[in-house]
Amino acid sequence: MNQTWRAHLQSKLQQLHKQGQYRNLYVTEQAEETWLIRDKKRMLNLASNNYLGLAGDERLKEAAIACTKRYGTGATASRLVVGNHPLYEEVERSICDWKGTERALIVNSGYTANIGAISSLASRHDIVFSDKLNHASIVDGIILSGAEHKRYRHNDLDHLEKLLKMASPEKRKLIVTDTVFSMDGDTAYLRDLVQLKEKYGAIIIVDEAHASGIYGIGGAGLSHIEKNLSQKIDIHMGTFSKALGCYGAYLTGDEIYIEYLQNMMRSFIFTTALPPSTLGAVQKAIEIVKEDNERRENLIANGEYFRTKLRDAGFDIGNSSTHIVPIVVGSNEHALRFSKRLQEAGIAAIAIRPPTVPVHSSRIRFAVTSQHTIADLKWAIDRIIHIAKEEEIFV
């Protein structure tokens, strides 16, 4: 191996170790279940994005198997070559019916959706206004676009409006936000954001990754909670990999936006399409979430119970109002030690550190699901409180 490169990479890895930011892969079994297995130890799964418990649902498995038997295991090409399987049209039509939009485009992941859409729409002639706590894929898309990047303080609409006022009138404006923030569990003020985009002649993209399947009528997303709000949003992005228990993502909105992305989005054009099995499972998942109010109600109730108990116990859970509940502890070392103790006690709870979250805000990110029982959550809360007292992490 080239010794210059070896020395450079070793130095970088040593730096990550020293900063408490080195990452490992751990084999995990039964991650689709409420209780998983890691290092031969059974743990309560409070780290998964399988919010509605659909990743292990027999109906999705059967749909995936049926599509594999009928159509094979691979897409064989990109969608623009010969990989545009008949199921794509069916699922995209289902998404439009679900979201009330004109056209949809299925892509391979939420990350490729965001980097592709933003870098295709925006250029050096434009300004993108982005919430400071938006997902990394949004940030990366803005960087790739070459657009002027204006970050507004988290959920601070006064700051956003100030930036909009200061923007050059010659430049096109794009606002982008998560709807549910993945590391904090709070939500964007969508109605106010839409008012600002209309006032200043911008367009808006919303990332519904952690809201699709959960909020709004039929689980269509946070943008569907308020009447007539979703139609004022230009592009909706959502994933199939979280509440829907599958894989992949979608972009949906007016015909012209999706037509443009289909022709310009490099992360869509230059990649092999999703396999038929995934599309079959996604179609079944959409059918289920549109009708299964009980799963959504259970998830929302479990989130409220878990948040309330942790907040009452004195933990810093920020402004969480959803099924994602962080305990912010500050340093990488505290987060890693707390995570280790929790896993030893039988709770799958993962330390989240920079650059995923801002410096000095390392945390344990808990995610409850609709499948957890109150007994499960109470059992976990008792152990979380006990370990936190021993580790002296209360604020």
Swiss-Prot record:
It catalyses: 6-carboxyhexanoyl-[ACP] + L-alanine + H(+) = (8S)-8-amino-7-oxononanoate + holo-[ACP] + CO2. Its cofactor is pyridoxal 5'-phosphate. The modification N6-(pyridoxal phosphate)lysine is found at residue 242. InterPro entries: Aminotrans_II_pyridoxalP_BS (IPR001917), Aminotransferase_I/II_large (IPR004839), AON_synthase_class-II (IPR050087), AONS_Archaea/Proteobacteria (IPR004723), PyrdxlP-dep_Trfase (IPR015424), PyrdxlP-dep_Trfase_major (IPR015421), PyrdxlP-dep_Trfase_small (IPR015422). Pathway: Cofactor biosynthesis; biotin biosynthesis. Pfam families: Aminotran_1_2 (PF00155). GO terms for molecular function: 8-amino-7-oxononanoate synthase activity; pyridoxal phosphate binding. Pyridoxal 5'-phosphate binds at residues 110-111, 182, 207-210, 239-242. Its EC number is 2.3.1.47. PROSITE patterns: AA_TRANSFER_CLASS_2 (PS00599). GO terms for biological process: biotin biosynthetic process. Substrate binds at residues 23, 135, 356. Keywords: Biotin biosynthesis, Pyridoxal phosphate, Transferase. Homodimer. Catalyzes the decarboxylative condensation of pimeloyl-[acyl-carrier protein] and L-alanine to produce 8-amino-7-oxononanoate (AON), [acyl-carrier protein], and carbon dioxide. Belongs to the class-II pyridoxal-phosphate-dependent aminotransferase family. BioF subfamily. This is Putative 8-amino-7-oxononanoate synthase. It comes from Bacillus cereus (strain G9842). The lineage of its organism: Bacteria, Bacillati, Bacillota, Bacilli, Bacillales. The gene is bioF.
